[in-house]
Structure formats: structure tokens, C-alpha cells
Amino acid sequence: MRHTLPIAPQFYVTAPQACPYLDGRRERKLFTALQGDQAETLNNSLSKQGFRRSQNVLYRPSCTDCAACLSARIRVADFAPRRGHKRISRRNEHLFRNPRSAWATEEQYALFRTYLDTRHADGGMADMDVFEFAAMIEETPVKTRVIEYRDRTDGDDLAAVCLTDILDDGLSLVYSFFAPELQKNSLGTYVILDHIALAQEAGLPYVYLGYWVPGSTKMGYKASFPALEVHVNGDWQDIGDPADYDTQTHPLSTDPIAQQVAQITLPDLRGENGRSDGLRGFSDGP
């Protein structure tokens, strides 16, 4: 019989570093560990509040003078593909979906390296070796799949890969990459379109895309999807006109970290034997 009390999640803050999306900005993240029997429950709850998973950590931006990064998701039931989306789907009809367990392969890593070297050679992941890649894929305490996309007309060659979490209300695209020589096929957009179809098949209402950043050319394509919602001031709302979003934020408009943590709604992590006191932990990270 368990007599110890479950420990409430502890939240930490990363040290500021250069923003990968907007020049001249500094990013900072609020994060907590994702572990134990209740990891899936916590992941489901915090994903609805704008958090993202990276291995066994959940995080969301908590920058001191910027709030440009907005968590984005698509309402599957309301999604109607635009003409350009239909063209992209037809352009990739030769691909087939191949879901796998979260287990890294040498073939996936080879494609990952080619993708980084071609498109993100100066990015934060550029130096990842095969062991770090395996950790990114395999270190998951929640329900995760690797969705491969293979070319049936070319010996089933690997064309794209998406690391996908299965939430209680949707699919979350954790990270995706594709063959750079197929860039003209808009594979990044195609992977999202296929995940919308996959969510429809599974009866899941949302597809989580990660962060949309107004003013960032890297993230602009996400705003092209109909039925897109963004997480703003604690609530999900229809994106409306992307041009209405301002990347400039007054420094005093950002809540202190302790207040941000206090506003997080934690799930009931009590098991059959034990109770949670509901307290939130907070510590400054290194």
C-alpha cells in the first residue's frame, strides 16, 4: 500500500538565450519534468494550456519582454482544405503512411541529418549525433508514435518522418523532418494535412502544431490552415486575421513567473491510494 503523498510538479525557468524565430529577441522557457505514472495525465492537461513536450520535459515560452510565440491547433471537425492544400495532397499521392513505435532507426537519422545540414545548418539542433537523436525519439513517458512517409514509386524510400504524441483530445506534432530534395512537394504541409486525416479517423478533435510566431518566416505557413486556434491569455481563440497580431509587447504586460505558475491548472494526480495537496512548486532554473 502506498502511504507517501504524490509530489506536485515543480516548475523551473531556463536562462535567457537568443530567440530562434525573431532576430534580436531573447527567449526563456518555463518547464517541468514529465515522469512517473501520471505523466500522460499531466501531458494531456498542460498541452491544453500551451505547453509542448520535448523528451521528458514539458515547456512553454515565458519571455521577459515578448509574448509572440502562440501555441496553435487545428479544429479537425471545422477544417476544410483550401485549393492549395488539395494540390499538395495530390502532389504527394505516391506517399504512404507507416506508423511505428517510438524507436529510432539509422535510416531515420540519415534523413534527419540531411534535413538539418540542408535547411537548419546553423540551428540549435545542428550538432545532434545519433545518440541524441535516439533520445529525442525514444525518451517519451507518454503515448508516442513515429509516423513515416514512404514513396511507393521509389522502392519505399523514406521521404518524411513525424514524431507524434497521442493526446486525449488530439494529435500533437512534436517534430517533423523530410527529404530536402522534395521541398517543392511541400512535405511539411502535407504531413499536417495527413495528421488531420489521421485525427478524423481516430475521432480526435484537434491537431496541435506547436508554436505559431507572427513575424517569423519559419512559422508563417501554419497560419494558412483553416480552423486554426491560438492560445492567448489562457484561452484558445480562432486566429482571425494573422496580420492583426503584433510581435511587440510592453515589458510590464508580462506576468511574473510565480504568477504564471499559479495560473496553471494542474490535473488531479491522485491515484487510488494517496492524495495530492494541490500545491504548485516553483524554483528558478540554472
From Swiss-Prot:
Disulfide bond annotation, renumbered to this chain: none
The keyword Acyltransferase is assigned to this record: yes
Reaction catalysis annotation: N-terminal L-glutamyl-[protein] + L-leucyl-tRNA(Leu) = N-terminal L-leucyl-L-glutamyl-[protein] + tRNA(Leu) + H(+); N-terminal L-aspartyl-[protein] + L-leucyl-tRNA(Leu) = N-terminal L-leucyl-L-aspartyl-[protein] + tRNA(Leu) + H(+)
Known EC number: 2.3.2.29
Subcellular location: Cytoplasm
Cellular compartments per GO CC: cytoplasm
GO biological process: ubiquitin-dependent protein catabolic process via the N-end rule pathway
Keyword terms: Acyltransferase, Cytoplasm, Transferase
Molecular-function GO terms, alphabetical: arginyl-tRNA--protein transferase activity; leucyl-tRNA--protein transferase activity
Domain of life assignment: Bacteria
The protein's role, per its UniProt record: Functions in the N-end rule pathway of protein degradation where it conjugates Leu from its aminoacyl-tRNA to the N-termini of proteins containing an N-terminal aspartate or glutamate.
Protein family membership: Belongs to the R-transferase family. Bpt subfamily.
PANTHER family referenced in this protein's UniProt entry, alphabetically: ARGININE-TRNA-PROTEIN TRANSFERASE 1, ARGINYL-TRNA--PROTEIN TRANSFERASE 1
Name of the protein this chain belongs to: Aspartate/glutamate leucyltransferase
